[in-house]
Each structure stands twice: as C-alpha cells, then as structure tokens.
Amino acid sequence: MRFKGLDLNLLVALDALMTERNLTAAARQINLSQPAMSAAIARLRSYFRDELFTMRGRELVPTPGAEALAGPVREALLHIQLSIISRDAFDPTLSSRRFRVILSDFMTIVFFRRIVDRIAQEAPAVRFELLPFSDEPGELLRRGEVDFLILPELFMSSAHPKATLFDETLVCVGCRTNKQLLRPLTFEKYNSMGHVTAKFGRALRPNLEEWFLLEHGLKRRIEVVVQGFSLIPPILFDTGRIGTMPLRLARHFEKWMPLRIVEPPLPLPTFTEAVQWPAFHNTDPASIWMRRILLEEASNMGSADRKLPTRRRC
C-alpha cells in the first residue's frame, strides 16, 4: 500500500531498524530476508533523501533525520495496531499478552507481587516483564516500549493519563543493635550518622527524601549509594549507619531482618504512588483490564501501620 508515493511497509522496516540497530536482527523481527531489508533501507533513503543509518561495526547508527522520524513512525504504527488490527474482544483467560512495566523494587515487593499472584489465577498465560527505573520513562511510554509506569506521581509527565494507587510515607531504619536509635532521633544525630541511600536509573537520580532535603538546603553524610531501596537493610546490618525508605517496605524487611524503624527527625512528606499508561492505550481492552486489576489491588492495600516501638528517652 502506498501513501503519497511511500510504501507503508517501509515504515515497519524503519521502526524495526530503529529498535534493533542491526540489519540482521531487524530483518528477523519482521520476517524479511537480509537482502530484502537492505533493499528497504535503499528505498527509505531515496524517499526521505537522507542516509538514515551509518555503519559502526555491525551496529546501525541513526542519523538525526532517522531519529526525528522514529517517534512519529512508532506512534503511527501503534495507532494502527490498536485501532484497526487489535479490535477483537479481550479474553484474559485466553490471552498470552505480555505487559512491560517500569517500577521500583519497593513497588515490586509490596504491591506487584499481589498482581502476579492474582493474574496467575485469573489469566495464567499473561506474562510480565518488570523493568527498573529509566532516566526517560515518559519517552518509553510515548514510543510504546512499555505498557505501564508505576512511580511516585510527582515523577510522572502530564502527557499521558494516570491513576492514583496509594499514599506512602518514609521512615528511618537502622540495625536493631544500633544504640543511637534507642532514643528519639535528633536532626543533629541524623546529620552526623553515615547514611545509606537509594538512587535510581543510570544517572543515579536522587530519591524522594533527598529531593526534600535538597529543597531545604540540607545535606547528609552519605557513605553508601545503592540501586534500590531493598538493598538498604543488608548494608545496615551490624553497623551504626542509617537509611530512609518507604514504611511498607521497612515493615516487610522487619519481619526477617534485625531492623529498627524510627521516625525521621523532621517530617518527610507523604508521597503518592500512581500508575501511568500511554495515551493511545486508553481504549485498548487489555490495558483497561490490567488497569482495573491494578486499582482493585491498590484499594485492598489499606494503610501502612505507622505505630513505631517506644524508645527510651534521655
């Protein structure tokens, strides 16, 4: 099929080339022979009057022109897929749909385990690919490379729809043998202790408590940086260090690690975990079904138990 002289099948080839950045892999993805894919590149170059790709070893490196085309082409193909091709009724009991979800280790442990357990009963062939925090999660949504983001709402873009899951609070944690935590934690003591903190993505972006402290001009003595909240408790074991993490996750680790949970010396703001999906998935039956499951399970979470142990005072 042609539109203004362009064979629309070439857009499928271009999308595969941008995704794979390798001629053989892109050809395999769309069931073309390697010579046919080479011919498609030649026709694309002729139509767009741009080299589109240069070779670096076996890697195809896109030109600025190809980069500019990639987003609109991917969006157009996704709209065609969702609006025309995927119009059949969605039956979760028969579906083998794979959902790609970006979320933190905190949300994986305290929330998404519930989703996986429920889906195993209701839709046993549905699969999940859980991905770590990306430096550009909104861009992955726009390109249709992920189905959902589950993140603190303040990190989400306004370009895509979203829904609130539940509120969470931050607490300080340390090893149960840490005698500095037997008394109320003062700000001076908090500042003087060595901290273990979680940062996310390749750029090691600060987490919520660090954003809050930086906004107030406060700086801690960070001794260890880890990729995710769940790595904080093991680093605290048998040390005088302290960490800050979501209360529900601290309660989870408290059950099987010698962890002491204490109130921070200054009130850290509550944050809202939310789910976001691509705008073009709004009417996708599979996405609608999955969103319903997520919201139902979130409503069953209840509130985290904030009652902390009584500590001796000076």
From Swiss-Prot:
Q: Where are the transmembrane segments?
A: none
DNA-binding stretch(es), residue numbering of this chain = 23-42
Q: Which InterPro entries match?
A: LysR-type_TF, LysR_subst-bd, NodD_PBP2, Tscrpt_reg_HTH_LysR, WH-like_DNA-bd_sf, WH_DNA-bd_sf
Cell inner membrane keyword on record: no
Task: Enumerate the spans annotated as HTH lysR-type domain.
Answer: 6-63
Q: Which keywords accompany this UniProt record? A: Activator, DNA-binding, Nodulation, Repressor, Transcription, Transcription regulation
- Transcription regulation in keyword set: yes
The record's GO molecular-function terms, alphabetically, read: DNA binding; DNA-binding transcription factor activity
Q: Which domain of life is it from?
A: Bacteria
What is this protein's function per UniProt? NodD regulates the expression of the nodABCFE genes which encode other nodulation proteins. NodD is also a negative regulator of its own expression. Binds flavonoids as inducers.
Family (UniProt): Belongs to the LysR transcriptional regulatory family.
Q: What else is known?
A: There are at least two nodD genes in B.elkanii.
From the Swiss-Prot or TrEMBL record, give the protein name.
Nodulation protein D 1
Originating organism: Bradyrhizobium elkanii
The major lineage groups are:
Bacteria, Pseudomonadati, Pseudomonadota, Alphaproteobacteria, Hyphomicrobiales
